[in-house]
Amino acid sequence: MKVLGIETSCDDCCVAVVENGIHILSNIKLNQPEHKKYYGIVPEIASRLHTEAIMSVCIKALKKANTKISEIDLIAVTSRPGLIGSLIVGLNFAKGLAISLKKPIICIDHILGHLYAPLMHSKIEYPFISLLLSGGHTLIAKQKNFDDVEILGRTLDDACGEAFDKVAKHYDMGFPGGPNIEQISKNGDENTFQFPVTTFKKKENWYDFSYSGLKTACIHQLEKFKSKDNPTTKNNIAASFQKAAFENLITPLKRAIKDTQINKLVIAGGVASNLYLREKIDKLKIQTYYPPLDLCTDNGAMIAGLGFNMYLKYGESPIEIDANSRIENYKNQYRGKNNEKNFSNA
């Protein structure tokens, strides 16, 4: 079965063709550099650019896959969560294709797509612990299947990638913040500033994260945390912030691994491409899986891959389904698309 995957939840316009849930025939992504001068995503600009680009991106994906549009068996599309304008562009485009081609459509949760991405590269047996790190989401989950996901911990404020973006904006390091801070930090001393690392002692927040304190310390209280006579340079700020940002993840992650007694870890999301983070994770000395770099960031392949499996198990989505910018009725457990404990109706 050939699945056309469409992902437009934020600023990347992505279309892919995937066969049988795992064989990637094409995976096309168009970035939107227009946002760089604003140091962040402007929703109105993002949705307009998606409207202008999605047809050509789809044609490129089909051409690279050597596939005619009539040969597509299923259309998978991200319907939540994300920027509502961007989601609507992708969803309406997918609906138009489904209606005109008389093909089924399956709507996919963006978060579950990221959690599925590593399985397209490596054969990983369930259960395992997943760590999702992106500009919009930071969470730890226990996965028993592609549709059986228990959220153990999540950020209580900023996402990890969001904190990188805000620090980078303040110090004029460029957008997006993650890759720029990683590059700038290579020539810095990570011990110049001893920024605070947040860990929670309450049971209900045992696996949760917080980045607001670190962000505030780095932006507004810089000299308070200076511990060496090194100069206050962008390189040293970037290196010290990056160190603290990833140390922030380690304690909740260790707790989750110990308490669940699951020694397999899967890393997903755009921040997973950071090589410094990978060095930190490798020191945990557990079996760890990373998706290739093109599957770390937003992409259509993960939507098509998960869409294949969801369709086989649950069937198609109603054509009337709407885009949703948020995760409704957030619960800690996700089991299938019809379970009352869903954190997604996708």
Swiss-Prot record:
GO cellular component, one term: cytoplasm
InterPro entries: ATPase_NBD, Gcp-like_dom, KAE1/TsaD, Peptidase_M22_CS, TsaD
Cofactor: Fe(2+)
Keywords of the record: Acyltransferase, Cytoplasm, Iron, Metal-binding, Transferase, tRNA processing
EC number, as in UniProt: 2.3.1.234
GO process annotations (BP): tRNA threonylcarbamoyladenosine modification
Binding site for Fe cation: H110, H114, D298
PANTHER family from the UniProt entry: TRNA N6-ADENOSINE THREONYLCARBAMOYLTRANSFERASE (PTHR11735), TRNA N6-ADENOSINE THREONYLCARBAMOYLTRANSFERASE, MITOCHONDRIAL (PTHR11735:SF6)
UniProt function note: Required for the formation of a threonylcarbamoyl group on adenosine at position 37 (t(6)A37) in tRNAs that read codons beginning with adenine. Is involved in the transfer of the threonylcarbamoyl moiety of threonylcarbamoyl-AMP (TC-AMP) to the N6 group of A37, together with TsaE and TsaB. TsaD likely plays a direct catalytic role in this reaction.
Similarity annotation: Belongs to the KAE1 / TsaD family.
Protein name: tRNA N6-adenosine threonylcarbamoyltransferase
Gene source species: Borreliella burgdorferi (strain ZS7)
Name of the gene: tsaD
